[in-house]
Amino acid sequence: CQYVATAPHYLESWGDVEIKKGHYSLMQPTIHPLFNTRQFQDTLLKWTGSDQSYYDYLRAMWETNVLGGKSWNKALHDGSFKVGAEDQEVTLNEVDLAAANAALSSAGDSEMEITVYVKTGLGDGQQANNPWLQELPDPITRTSWDNYLLISRIDAERLGIKNWTVDNGALNGNLVNVTANGVTMNNVPAYIQPGQAPGSVSIALGYGRTDLKKDMKVGVNAYPLAGSAYHEVSIEKAEGVHEFACVQLQHTIMGREGEILKETTLEDFVNKPVEEWNHAPVFSLDHQEVTQDKVDLWEPFDDTIGTKFNLSIDLATCTACAACIVACHAENNVPVVGKHEIRVSRDMHWLRVDRYYSSEMTVERGKEEGIFGSGDFFEAQTHPSDAPEVSFQPVMCQHCN
């Protein structure tokens, strides 16, 4: 016999967390539950014969054990509460290093190992029926509506696996059969990922669910491969071609770091004049290079009469988590277009976060090899490094400023 106990979304729920020892935070619902659901903790209370709601239980627990006479409403307003905690001495004496080394030694000498992970958007698959999350491009691969086997360029070339761009600009790739943990998964899309360690492959959990709406039944179920941190894996190329829904096919900045992606080191930021690490852009006007203020299409706007709101993003801390993209989608009622339209460059995200890899071919190297300015030079610049540095560039529509 099976029972279904529907629970609300976490944004419809009460809860608390201990961020670290002595630091507590409260979770409160942002909206009233949309459907006739009951929070899991309320269900537990009901099953134990209690008529108390989880909100009442949570508040009583905080007032008794956490707040120490302080105001519940203030803690709720502030979002966090700190209590005194004794320092704890941490030692490694209880870690059985010998057993860990023995486990590694017995892992085998397979050429390949597989790791499973969860994506930033879809997570473990509990929200796989949410089209916002399905359409959200992965911050690194920039691909949506899919999971896939990530493989390094070196291993892909050895196995004859390829990704290629077709005439309409969309990305295609080979399929592979994957065997690990005693399980074989057939026809898994293979995506060549810069920075993937040779000898390793990985695949995201949360996809391949069969109890969803038709358009949400995408990807392959990788849970049978999960069991431990390490699995030997065998991979063989399969017949057929997979069509990816990838929103970014230009993966390197191609020598335009100072024009499009402005970055510098902390040392240069502190010690060098701003003109050296933040060059002012120049434009051509009447056959002369002029600064931006000379070519503005609009008359200056007097913003002294009131507040002028602005948005600044600290690129040093942006990890492309994509929470802003989903928030923008929700706030502005942006439609979801589906995998096919994403594939043919018709995504409707108002906000995107481009991802750029570093390339081994730089201007300096091109000049040293005597190919700077040639077709070979520009072709080499399009190839990411096997162990690239990664930069993120948020690109917003005018509503954000």
Predicted regions and their residues:
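A cross-kingdom feature strongest in bacterial/archaeal respiratory oxidoreductases
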Residues: 1-34, 62-351, 361-362
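Non-catalytic, well-ordered alpha-helical segments in soluble enzyme domains
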Residues: 38-63
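Secondary-structure capping and boundary motifs in well-ordered enzyme cores
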Residues: 23, 317-320, 389, 396, ...
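Short Gly/Pro-enriched turn/cap motifs at secondary-structure boundaries
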Residues: 35, 139-140, 385-388, 397
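Stable alpha-helical elements in mature extracytoplasmic
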Residues: 40-43, 393, 401
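Primarily the internal scaffold of c-type cytochrome electron-transfer domains
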Residues: 325, 329-395
